[in-house]
Amino acid sequence: MMETERLVLPPLDPLNLPLRALEVGCTGRWELLNVPGPPESTLPHGLPPCAPDLCQEAEQLFLSSPAWLPLHGVEHSARKWQRKTDPWSLLAAVETPVPSDLQAQRHPTTGHILGYKEVLLENTNLSATTSLSLRRPPGPASQSLWGNPTQYPFWPGGMDEPSITDLHTREEAEEEIDFEKDLLTVPPGFKKGVDFAPKDHPAPVPGLLSLSRLLEPLDLSGGDEDEGEAAGGPRGDNASPSPSGTPLVRASSLEDLVLKEAATVVSTPEPPKPPPQEQWAVPVDVTSPVGDFYRLIPQPAFQWAFEPDVFQKQAILHLEQHDSVFVAAHTSAGKTVVAEYAIALAQKHMTRTIYTSPIKALSNQKFRDFRNTFGDVGLLTGDVQLHPEASCLIMTTEILRSMLYSGSDVIRDLEWVIFDEVHYINDAERGVVWEEVLIMLPEHVSIILLSATVPNALEFADWIGRLKRRQIYVISTVARPVPLEHYLFTGNSPKTQGELFLLLDSRGAFHTQGYYAAVEAKKERMSKHAQTFGAKQPTHQGGPAQDRGVYLSLLASLRTRAQLPVVVFTFSRGRCDEQASGLTSLDLTTSSEKSEIHLFLQRCLARLRGSDRQLPQVLHMSELLRRGLGVHHSGILPILKEIVEMLFSRGLVKVLFATETFAMGVNMPARTVVFDSMRKHDGSTFRDLLPGEYVQMAGRAGRRGLDPTGTVILLCKGRVPEMADLHRMMMGKPSQLQSQFRLTYTMILNLLRVDALRVEDMMKRSFSEFPSRKDSKAHEQALADLTKRLGALEEPDVTGQLADLPEYYSWAEELTETQNMIQRRIMESVNGLKSLSVGRVVVVKNEEHHNALGVILQVSSNSTSRVFTTLVLCDKPVVSDNPRDKGPATPDVPHPDDLIGFKLFLPEGPCEHTVAKLQPGDVAAISTKVLRVNGEKISEDFSKRQQPKFRKDPPLAAVTTAVQELLRLAQSYPAGPPTLDPINDLQLKDVAVVEGGLRARKLEELIRGAQCVHSPRFPAQYVKLRERMQIQKEMERLRFLLSDQSLLLLPEYHQRVEVLRTLGYVDEAGTVKLAGRVACAMSSHELLLTELMFDNALSALRPEEIAALLSGLVCQSPGDPGDQLPSTLKQGVERVKAVAKRIGEVQVACGLNQTVEEFVGELNFGLVEVVYEWARGMPFSELAGLSGTPEGLVVRCIQRLAEMCRSLRGAARLVGEPVLGAKMETAATLLRRDIVFAASLYTQ
């Protein structure tokens, strides 16, 4: 009502005046009164007011006269803006691909152009976002190097790509398609389809009409007879087959229907030949010299100042033929020669080469070496991009994987990909990258694999060959170019510096006398209890003082023998620093060498700012280097590690203390290699060095062309290691190449966004699936043979009394499997094995005996299982054609008596016995009966009577008594003796055993009630059914092996896809959504980073705060963020952990094995404050006080963080978040400064 009062009502009609008519008297005169209001009343205040009817008032205001409403005001009408017209835009047209091109016609001899002709172009409508073909047009120039996460990769080599020719071939062979079995019933995107199977009985299959019969000459005289036969004779759909009995085969054309002369002799069909064994890995003989090398290659693409070795020449010959090679050679054998020739060959062919390495340090070193040799070389790492247009590009394997997934146009011109240090595929964290790259490489790219010697090089090459469908030539070296001598050193003072004992000579002979001499030297020192001759507790490694004495005596001995420089491998960063600092009293360089070192340090450190040059680590390392000492591990600043490497390569560093990473690929040979210990911590436990690890590090000893032999020394600070451990470490086989393939969310999303590629195909082609997939061709052939064999079998009769024959067969099979399962669980249990003591009566069932009673004589154990020496009843061996006289055998047709219980074997003639060694699987049942036997005496007597001399001797009374007791039990219990109940007697509470027992009793009842066993035709029909069912079972097994369901990682794949679907990265049909495309752009922690971005957890923070929080995702050293953080960072850390916890809970809900605590535990926020202050501009010299983390690890964390910021910047642009993208760009800029991002010395 209040709203109505505020409305401005329209003016009244002028004729609608407030007048009233009043009759005056009775004369008929009327007067008009202008007094408004209600009729006059005697009430003092008139009638009370009343509210008007709302419906009538609303109709009057809004429906009768709506013109007063603001809606109809002209000021609220649509406005029109004058646009700027451009008539010339009408003439613009979108460029369409040119459907044809001009091709020059040249003279075949001279090459002169004779004319031009127009040729049609194919695939002109392809693009990088719709096609995987190499024929698609290149993308923008700005994306030619790195590609784009929205682009498709190129089609991987080795996968079946349908071509136009294949499509035409399929159309021509269309009649070979089975329209009843080969048609799909589930539409794309649907979970269920339509079942077109007939409900009742299948319709009869129409037979083929013989055209030759229609073309037979007509017999005009016998037309009436033919008509009669057509009307009522046997000719028709159900006519009997032709006399020849050969089935009619569909012909592809009428030309095939020619009359052929009947063969007079019917030849028996030959058995099908097995398919030829495919040999993808071809070993190359490197023992014989290549005499015609220069005749085969008169003008090699590259020449060296030395004569290549035989294995290098063999590899070069195959490179000239564009073959793929796998070079497995010893350390320092010269594998780089093969890579150099491939680079030169690519430059000659005007193509490109990519050289991949496992670590960035090796990439930088190879960039310097190859640039000095070839010049046209580029470098692509996470933070450096030099000469990307070069013919040879050096990069890490992760960058090549990113280029492959992003469809980089560099792949088009690629001829060679060189994988250095392929044995790094065994790395649990990064080994999957090698497999991904090898699978995704296109077909036109040839592969060069360089590796240390591995025992399964042929197997690995066979996998790659089958993967790429091309032969891989395996070239291995026979021996090292510089042989090694291995010693034990037990000295620890100047008096004992000569205690160096040869253990393994250069010919590979192990010297036990050297080992015993080292043991005696240690024992002699212990017996004297002299302080100067060693530690009081020789079983321990000792402290810094003992280490100092050991190294002083060792280095004095090596200087006397002129065996410097030396690399000391120590498996701890802290011990490396301690040992080097303890030798500061040594001075191993001359004055000229000191001057050279000083000038080199000044030139290298001049790149740093003043405060960075005064870092404690820089000053300490400079002092060590001037004395000829060096330290190399991950805690050292990158620029200092490069200085140490360069000085070591010049021979100015005499003693280098290094961790295991120094041996990986970096070509830094020394005269001597020393092992501080033979034990290391692998991240979980302490263990001995593996043979492959030892060989890799020991291979740094011996400089080719300078040293006749290399020296390897193992320090014995405490006790001398066991001889067996030393022999296994030094002479054992290196570790095999093993697959570390695992599923990652990035891999799944990158493949799901491409319809033509499937994650299952990636899993099939992984090295982990190779053992089960390498026989796929044989499985397909066996499946085809079984299909033919099944079609030729006669159907069993299952009518009448045999109606339940199929059920009886399934019941019998299930009962047998259930009984075997229960017995297997019994034999695996503790109580079951305890019951198998001497004298226990058992039922034996194996190839020699079927349900024969036996008594256990002896119980022994080997490395794998227990062995039971058992006296078993058997028949006397006779020679007869009757199968029943040849001893007990498994019945062909199982009757109920054979399935229920144990129908014991009873000798039909004279009862004999034997003593057999039984495995747990040979015991079919354990009876409750126990006999008193002398097992040792019975075994000795039986062994004696097996000799020809005593074969006719009668058995002992103990043997005869045991046999008679067994025979009496067999006759008393023909259906089997009472057995130990697995639940009541053996106390097995396993659910499977309990349920199996119940199911077995149910199956026994069903088998007793079967009617088919009473039919006289039961045995024959059962054999037919069993043969058919066995073939079908084998076919199901082969189909399973060939299907995706046999993949080992398929359950995990479904679980990870469910995680992506729950989080909204893919939809129900598997289509990648926006969040999934953003995750594809991330290099690591893709789910966590994407969730943080979509939760808007980063946009409100400042760039330095974002960088500090993201450090928890890349930091490798665990630690606590501390209490000095600003409140914003504390809240940010908790929010990141909360998001990680939510993702972990989703993973657990979807079935993944990783717990929530393990997933959240991958985050380390120990460097949050350090990164925060660094991004705010704090000098690096002041960061040391904020954290105890080594400087090298801090630098590595900030470098990886800058890469992550760039990934987030690209993802923000993809989503359309310019504010976040600008902040990530600013964060990366704040991080990239000073010593953390100092340019590599190898690139200058």
UniProtKB/Swiss-Prot annotation:
A single cellular component GO annotation: Ski complex
Protein name (record): Superkiller complex protein 2
Keywords of this entry: ATP-binding, Cytoplasm, Helicase, Hydrolase, Nucleotide-binding, Nucleus, Phosphoprotein, RNA-binding
Function recorded in the entry: Helicase component of the SKI complex, a multiprotein complex that assists the RNA-degrading exosome during the mRNA decay and quality-control pathways. The SKI complex catalyzes mRNA extraction from 80S ribosomal complexes in the 3'-5' direction and channels mRNA to the cytosolic exosome for degradation. SKI-mediated extraction of mRNA from stalled ribosomes allow binding of the Pelota-HBS1L complex and subsequent ribosome disassembly by ABCE1 for ribosome recycling. In the nucleus, the SKI complex associates with transcriptionally active genes in a manner dependent on PAF1 complex (PAF1C).
Gene: Skic2
Reactions performed catalytically: ATP + H2O = ADP + phosphate + H(+)
Region (Disordered): 218-249
DEVH box (motif): residue ranges: 420-423
Domain of life: Eukaryota
Residue numbers carrying Phosphoserine: S242, S253
Gene3D superfamilies xrefs: 1.10.3380.30, P-loop containing nucleotide triphosphate hydrolases (3.40.50.300)
EC number(s) reported in the record: 3.6.4.13
A molecular-function term among this protein's GO annotations: 3'-5' RNA helicase activity
Pfam short name (any one): MTR4_beta-barrel
Coiled-coil regions, chain positions: none
Family under the similarity heading: Belongs to the helicase family. SKI2 subfamily.
Annotated GO biological process: nuclear-transcribed mRNA catabolic process, 3'-5' exonucleolytic nonsense-mediated decay; rescue of stalled ribosome
Protein location: Nucleus; Cytoplasm
EC category: hydrolase
Domain (Helicase ATP-binding) ranges: 316-472
Main subcellular location: nucleus
Transit peptide recorded as keyword: no
